């Protein structure tokens, strides 16, 4: 029985184990492009000299936040609070509930630490907005 040629052996073993590698010069094309991520209704606008465009944007309810750098979440939140006083009132009212729950829990667990923490939080309205940092700063 004659032995098969080396090229035939390679072809048979390649079919059994894997597909042949793409030839040099051919590009691999992705199957489908990704869908763009959806963003909230917050729109960043650039400065425009055309007052008609600005007036049109104001009529549509688009709020402009201008920044020279990459804004962080705190910067965007402050800008939104300045443009939406109703949202500011809603956000300020929301943290009061977790703070009240925390103060009740602290009364049950630790008496001395609660006396220091409750005196500071009741006298300062700014600390209400910085609730996540309050536990990490306590001794």
From Swiss-Prot:
InterPro entries: FLYWCH_N, FWCH1/FWCH2
Chain intervals with Low complexity compositional bias: 120-130
Protein name in UniProt: FLYWCH family member 2
Originating organism: Mus musculus
Origin: domain of life: Eukaryota
Region feature Disordered, mapped onto this chain: 1-36, 86-139
Ranges annotated as biased composition (Basic and acidic residues): 98-107
PANTHER family: FLYWCH FAMILY MEMBER 2 (PTHR31665:SF0), FLYWCH FAMILY MEMBER 2-RELATED (PTHR31665)
Pfam families listed in its UniProt record: FLYWCH_N
């Amino acid at each position: 029985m004659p032995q098969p040629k080396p090229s035939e052996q390679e072809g048979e073993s390649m079919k059994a184990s894997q597909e042949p590698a793409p030839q040099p010069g051919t590009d691999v094309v992705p199957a489908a492009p990704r869908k763009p991520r959806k963003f909230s209704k917050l729109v960043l606008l650039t400065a425009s000299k055309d007052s008609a465009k600005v007036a049109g944007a104001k009529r549509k309810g688009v709020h402009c936040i201008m920044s020279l750098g990459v804004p962080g979440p705190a910067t965007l939140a402050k800008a939104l609070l300045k443009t939406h006083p109703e949202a500011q009132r809603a956000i300020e009212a929301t943290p009061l509930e977790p703070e009240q729950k925390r103060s009740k829990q602290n009364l049950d667990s630790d008496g001395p630490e609660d006396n220091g923490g409750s005196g500071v939080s009741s006298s300062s309205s700014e600390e209400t907005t910085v609730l996540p940092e309050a536990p990490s700063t306590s001794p």
